[in-house]
Amino acid sequence: MAGSEDKRVVGTLHLLLLQATVLSLTAGNLSLVSAAWTQEKNHHQPAHLNSSSLQQVAEGTSISEMWQNDLRPLLIERYPGSPGSYSARQHIMQRIQRLQAEWVVEVDTFLSRTPYGYRSFSNIISTLNPEAKRHLVLACHYDSKYFPRWDSRVFVGATDSAVPCAMMLELARALDKKLHSLKDVSGSKPDLSLRLIFFDGEEAFHHWSPQDSLYGSRHLAQKMASSPHPPGSRGTNQLDGMDLLVLLDLIGAANPTFPNFFPKTTRWFNRLQAIEKELYELGLLKDHSLERKYFQNFGYGNIIQDDHIPFLRKGVPVLHLIASPFPEVWHTMDDNEENLHASTIDNLNKIIQVFVLEYLHL
């Protein structure tokens, strides 16, 4: 009997071990399947708009409407915690919430220590289809650098970064009908949508340092890293859902050049170059020549400290659209409306809008 009992125990143990192995393998396979979507960004291919569609984009965007309705209300002093910061935040949210595309707007407010004590910061996150697994993300900062008033003048940071904010608002307006169609998800379309982020507290209050800079982006990157995505997921978070972070900064002066900073996103930089060339050849860019292209192939630029850094360190692919060299008016009182170049901004609006439509297959 003893021998029979031993065999039964051994047989039972063998069965339990086999079941545990099967369950483990099944769970592992489910985990792999559930995480497979995070790799789709690596082989995502854009659509290519034809000449007629490119013409429609050029006709659909309006530099005068952007200037009057989006940009001018932002050309104010708006350092974190200031009355202007509140006004800028309300302006951005109101311009987005009036659109048909049904953006979901979230304000991420938090306190952080600064050289002047604790300050309140508020990031603005505007998302189409938050339930989508993947998002193309456009971002900029809406705060202006704090400078003491000098001879009754204030620093309004036109290129830094009122213009990028206005460009993103104009993109949302000009593409409103097409972006609204992202609601119509079908099996033939990728589970992909668009997110706009307006960071607070990019600028240092005193001297740039790891502690005194990038307040909003540091906070949001950490928050997204600890937020499961899709909701309830155990192995993936909101950063996994970021296909590509396109960060706009120091835009608005004449004749900017944008280097390619990151080998990992070279194919997307190349796409911007191709769109620029296509629009130019169709006569849809103003005051522009290919002898002085915006998107230049002169090697990988030195990494510039900006709001993409906290996300880059956590593995998010980045396309950094910052003028390099910086505009001559950078961090001076002359970074104002008078020194902006409307044709350049209009041209870049067209290029970026085409890029977004192609990425999202719209």
From Swiss-Prot:
Subcellular location: Secreted
Signal peptide extent: 1-35
Active site residues of this protein: 202, 249
GO cellular component: extracellular region
Gene Ontology BP, a term: peptidyl-pyroglutamic acid biosynthetic process, using glutaminyl-peptide cyclotransferase
Listed Pfam families: Peptidase_M28
Binding site for Zn(2+): 160, 203, 331
Residues bearing glycans: 29, 50
Sorted UniProt keywords: Acyltransferase, Disulfide bond, Glycoprotein, Metal-binding, Secreted, Signal, Transferase, Zinc
Catalytic activity: N-terminal L-glutaminyl-[peptide] = N-terminal 5-oxo-L-prolyl-[peptide] + NH4(+)
EC number(s) per entry: 2.3.2.5
Family of this protein: Belongs to the glutaminyl-peptide cyclotransferase family.
Described purpose of this protein according to its UniProt entry: Responsible for the biosynthesis of pyroglutamyl peptides. Has a bias against acidic and tryptophan residues adjacent to the N-terminal glutaminyl residue and a lack of importance of chain length after the second residue.
Identification of the protein by name: Glutaminyl-peptide cyclotransferase
Annotated source species: Mus musculus (Mouse)
Phylogenetic placement of the source organism: Eukaryota, Metazoa, Chordata, Craniata, Vertebrata
Gene coding for it: Qpct
